[in-house]
Amino acid sequence: MKEARKRMVKRAVQEIKDGMNVNLGIGMPTLVANEIPDGVHVMLQSENGLLGIGPYPLEGTEDADLINAGKETITEVTGASYFDSAESFAMIRGGHIDLAILGGMEVSEQGDLANWMIPGKMVKGMGGAMDLVNGAKRIVVIMEHVNKHGESKVKKTCSLPLTGQKVVHRLITDLAVFDFVNGRMTLTELQDGVTIEEVYEKTEADFAVSQSVLNS
């Protein structure tokens, strides 16, 4: 795993508290499952009908019938349960998921999220993201701060089709952590070795800076 991804995943793990029901989105968020510390008991949910996902299996121990929503092989923890999609989405839409950690393509300064398609490119579909951003109690997004062309993915307004409006509570990038309250974006943490000036330079969105960052 790249060092930048490791930093984001390890920071995302800090969002998980003992006793939570948590959904991990497809892609980088699924790596969080391997980093949950001993003694923190959570139930990880997948939209395809499993509550109680464990870490990725070791090579040679994979069960091809045991997969997550991204079709990756997984393990299960003691007490895991299986159910159909109707029950899975009833959990999500009914507000029974405490935290969803999702990937992102773009996030706006008001907390809008675009994470499901790029026009003109083949996509599998929306999946459960739209349900999660409206049903889960808390939404944390993890993504790289800029795209492969060096353009900011933290935007004034999202240019890609939205998954949800004003749904993001916290954004974790390889540069910084931002919180969203009442449509206002605030820089609350810097990743190691990153300066406020670098964040300004690589962020299209307008944002405030918390006193704790200014004092650090």
Curated annotation (Swiss-Prot):
<dbReference type="Pfam" id="PF01144">
    <property type="entry name" value="CoA_trans"/>
</dbReference>
<comment type="similarity">
    <text>Belongs to the 3-oxoacid CoA-transferase subunit B family.</text>
</comment>
<dbReference type="GO" id="GO:0008410">
    <property type="term" value="F:CoA-transferase activity"/>
</dbReference>
<dbReference type="InterPro" id="IPR004165">
    <property type="entry name" value="CoA_trans_fam_I"/>
</dbReference>
<dbReference type="InterPro" id="IPR037171">
    <property type="entry name" value="NagB/RpiA_transferase-like"/>
</dbReference>
<comment type="subunit">
    <text>Heterodimer of a subunit A and a subunit B.</text>
</comment>
<dbReference type="InterPro" id="IPR004164">
    <property type="entry name" value="CoA_transf_AS"/>
</dbReference>
<keyword id="KW-0808">Transferase</keyword>
<dbReference type="InterPro" id="IPR012791">
    <property type="entry name" value="3-oxoacid_CoA-transf_B"/>
</dbReference>
<dbReference type="GO" id="GO:0008260">
    <property type="term" value="F:succinyl-CoA:3-oxo-acid CoA-transferase activity"/>
</dbReference>
<feature type="active site">
    <location>
        <position position="47"/>
    </location>
</feature>
<protein>
    <recommendedName>
        <fullName>Probable succinyl-CoA:3-ketoacid coenzyme A transferase subunit B</fullName>
        <ecNumber>2.8.3.5</ecNumber>
    </recommendedName>
</protein>
